Amino acid sequence: MTMSPCPLLLVFVLGLVVIPPTLAQNERYEKFLRQHYDAKPNGRDDRYCESMMKERKLTSPCKDVNTFIHGTKKNIRAICGKKGSPYGENFRISNSPFQITTCTHSGASPRPPCGYRAFKDFRYIVIACEDGWPVHFDESFISP
């Protein structure tokens, strides 16, 4: 008895439809981590910002503002669940404050070398989540 290629083709096509969102989501989460996660910061001063922005490839062109969250991946991800609350449309706010460093571009030109000023804070953070994973940090939120 020979098996028709149709069931195998169907499984393959369904796999293509189901897998890409997972890959795209993983890429967005990895980008979020690259841009905004630093578990153990060293210094948290202007040199820290200049070094981290360059290391994370956020200087071509010079990014105006970027915030690094200093915590565990587990605690940041938990904001997408029970450790966060709905905030506006499609965002979640952390139930607890996080240590953060915000790097603000201080140069006149958007071209490297990029100069940055560091601002250290301990505040609530707002992120967007997809299927329980952080994918975007809201730079515009400043906690009271």
Curated annotation (Swiss-Prot):
Keywords from the named record? Angiogenesis, Antibiotic, Antimicrobial, Cytoplasmic vesicle, Disulfide bond, Endonuclease, Hydrolase, Nuclease, Nucleus, Secreted, Signal
Q: Which BP terms from GO are recorded?
A: angiogenesis; antibacterial humoral response; defense response to bacterium; positive regulation of cell population proliferation; response to bacterium; RNA catabolic process
Q: Which Gene Ontology cellular component annotation is one that this UniProt entry carries? A: extracellular space
* Paired cysteines (S-S): C49-C103, C62-C114, C80-C129
Please state the span of the N-terminal signal peptide per the UniProt entry: 1-24
Its induction note reads:
Up-regulated in small intestine by contact with normal intestinal microflora. Expressed at very low levels in intestine from germ-free mice.
Q: Where does the protein end up?
A: Secreted; Cytoplasmic vesicle, Secretory vesicle lumen; Nucleus, Nucleolus
* EC number, as in UniProt: 3.1.27.-
Q: Where is this motif: Nucleolar localization signal?
A: 54-58
Q: Where is the active site?
A: H36 (proton acceptor), H136 (proton donor)
Query: Which CDD domains does the UniProt entry name for this protein?
Result: RNase_A_canonical
The record's GO molecular-function terms, alphabetically, read: endonuclease activity; nucleic acid binding; RNA nuclease activity
What SUPFAM superfamilies would the database entry show? Answer: RNase A-like (SSF54076)
Tissues where the protein occurs: Detected in small intestine, caecum and colon, with the highest expression in Paneth cells in the intestinal epithelium.
Please classify the protein's predominant subcellular localization into one broad category. secreted
Broad enzyme group: hydrolase
* UniProt keyword Transmembrane present: no
Q: Which family does it belong to?
A: Belongs to the pancreatic ribonuclease family.
Q: What does this protein do?
A: Has bactericidal activity against E.faecalis and L.monocytogenes, but not against L.innocua and E.coli. Promotes angiogenesis (in vitro). Has low ribonuclease activity (in vitro). Promotes proliferation of melanoma cells, but not of endothelial cells or fibroblasts (in vitro).
Question: What protein name does the entry list?
Answer: Angiogenin-4
